[in-house]
Amino acid sequence: MTTPTLLRVGLDIGGTKTEAVALDPNGRLVGRLRMPTELGAERVLATAERAVRGLSFQTGRPLSAFASIGIGIPGAVDRETGEVRHAFNLDLAELQLGRLLSELVGVPVRVENDVTAAALGANHLLELDGTIAYLNLGTGLAAGIVVDGAPWRGAHGVAGEIGHLPIDPNGYACPCGQFGCLETVASGSAISRAWPHGGEHPAQDVVRAMEAGDVEAAAVVARLVQGAASCVRVLALSLDPQSIIIGGGLRLLGEPLIGGIRATLEQWAEQSSFLAALDLPRRVRVLPKHSSAAAVGAAIIGA
């Protein structure tokens, strides 16, 4: 009798939706589902359990066929204990997510920061080698780093926290306590502050206004583009990666952002032979629109 193949499960728990995937031993996607994330510690746990059981139903496999579960989630993550703290967009102050979910479904669980998981997933899905940097342009700003297929976190686990690199000491206050950080320029929260009348989707609204000829909107978008291009330059000069992958919700702005980043990098290259030699525009890649990178990366981490 042939032993059934064990699957690896990955969850990407975000503030609005949770995505779950199942990978076979070769890393191929054999199951995927999405569902709304319910907020609050108990409901986040319930969402995670429902996602795992949903994958079991979808794949026609019992929970015992799942070798491991990895979870990518925002907030402060203790990778040793599986505890999550200060995940504000999930209305979650503290949750022993790894231990409690494992008790509910009977499968080992590992928990990781969502950006690190997305970096690992992007590296896998795009079949990249060497050193890659994943630039997450979302509500906040951070990067994940992968070296030879493994996440690199640094000595204290803060490698890639470029959102808290100050570039203007006279700039806006950052939640980290500093002033003028990159996150105050190149993030969804920065756009919300600069374009407060943009409704529920200020980034999309400001781009539409720019395209309609609004001068103020054009200045907001230009500041975002300059900040994002600066992030690419920082990652290139500090890590020298083969590829810099742009992910996060802001990437869905498309050409106004991505084309603007490349144009800015090209302009800088014209002004600096040093930057020109680095060929930064060629290194920039964009995560596809419907990519499951964070969930796939979580599945890999869970193994």
Residue ranges and their predicted role:
Residues 110, 116:
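Glycine/small-residue-rich loop that forms an oxyanion/phosphate-binding "nest" at active or ligand-binding sites
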Residues 15, 117, 139:
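Short, glycine/acidic-enriched loop or turn micro-motifs at the edges of active sites
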Residues 33-35, 88, 155:
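Short hydrophobic alpha-helix segments
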Residues 12, 68-74, 112, 134-140, ...:
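Short beta-strand segments
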Residues 1-68, 78-81, 103-107, 121-131, ...:
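ATP-binding/phosphotransfer module of carbohydrate and carboxylate kinases, centering on a glycine-rich
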Residues 130-185:
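Glycine-rich phosphate-binding loop of actin/hexokinase-like ATP-binding domains
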Residues 36-39, 92, 158-161:
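A short acidic/small-residue loop/turn micro-motif
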Residues 82-93:
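A charged helix-plus-loop insertion that forms the helical arch/lid used to bind
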